[in-house]
């Protein structure tokens, strides 16, 4: 089944839950979409959409029992406006998915602004890959080398996600501006420092080998270079 074009204009999605862990307000809809008889094999499908365009859309999420944080990003109260996207779905079929995000842009009430996010995401029963991953903010740019994770079936991916090895590399030319991070670190508000960054890491998340992390200010008054190993990341905070 092939669709040439789909357009979504003025979408306004409001998600909420009464407290952390409580069901979402759309839980009845989710339950209706779930198969009634889980012993039946899944229905075969093969879908392609050549272009999905999203413009002037909004998305909000609220945990009603939580107070709102001032002047910073709050994961319990997210309000996205001016959502734009250009997405291709070259292949959506049983156990084989390809999503090509040409551009996704948005603004969040905390001041977070993403001018462009894109990449090609592929998943099958044996391989998960990301290519051309790129994030642009008003004064920041992050570009990643292609990434790939291999596994033996969806069950292994779900059960051993933190134990699957991968290489993650942030390419030279990437940089972060403090002004773009003020929504996470309020003290950065009013500051405008650029830091050139790159890193090269490998291994499972539970035992990361850091070949190199480099950070240097654009003005040249600070440079930091690190290497080493980090273990136990999935358990941090437990």
Regions found by a protein language model. Name each.
Residues 108-114, 137-143, 216-224:
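Solvent-exposed loop/turn segments connecting transmembrane beta-strands
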Residues 46, 122, 200-202, 227-231:
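Transmembrane beta-barrel domains of outer membrane proteins
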Residues 111, 189-193:
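Short sequence motifs at beta-strands and strand-loop junctions characteristic
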Residues 1, 231-238:
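Short, intrinsically disordered, charge-balanced linker/junction segments flanking boundaries
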Residues 1-95, 112-114, 140, 144-151, ...:
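Secondary-structure transition motifs
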Residues 100-104, 128-135, 207-215:
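Transmembrane beta-strand segments that form the barrel wall of outer-membrane beta-barrel proteins
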């Amino acid at each position: 089944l092939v669709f040439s074009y789909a357009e979504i204009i003025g979408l306004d999605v409001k998600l909420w839950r009464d407290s952390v862990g409580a069901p979402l307000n759309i839980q009845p809809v989710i339950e209706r979409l779930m198969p009634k008889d889980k012993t039946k094999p899944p229905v075969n499908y093969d879908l392609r959409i050549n272009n999905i365009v999203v413009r002037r859309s909004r998305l909000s999420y609220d945990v009603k029992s939580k107070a709102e944080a001032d002047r910073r990003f709050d994961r319990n109260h997210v309000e996205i406006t001016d959502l734009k996207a250009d997405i291709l779905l070259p292949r959506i079929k049983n156990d084989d998915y390809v999503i090509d995000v040409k551009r996704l842009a948005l603004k969040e009430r905390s001041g977070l602004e993403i001018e462009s996010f894109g990449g090609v995401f592929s998943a099958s029963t044996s391989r998960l890959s990301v290519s051309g991953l790129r994030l642009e903010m008003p004064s920041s740019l992050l570009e990643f080398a292609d990434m790939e994770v291999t596994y033996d079936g969806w069950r292994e991916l779900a059960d051993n996600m933190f134990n699957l090895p991968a290489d993650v590399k942030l390419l030279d030319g990437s940089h972060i501006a403090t002004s773009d991070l003020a929504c996470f670190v309020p003290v950065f508000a009013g500051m405008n420092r650029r830091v050139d960054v790159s890193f090269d890491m490998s291994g499972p998340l539970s035992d990361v080998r850091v070949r190199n992390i480099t950070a240097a200010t654009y003005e040249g008054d600070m440079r930091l270079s690190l290497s080493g190993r980090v273990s136990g990341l999935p358990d941090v905070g437990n």
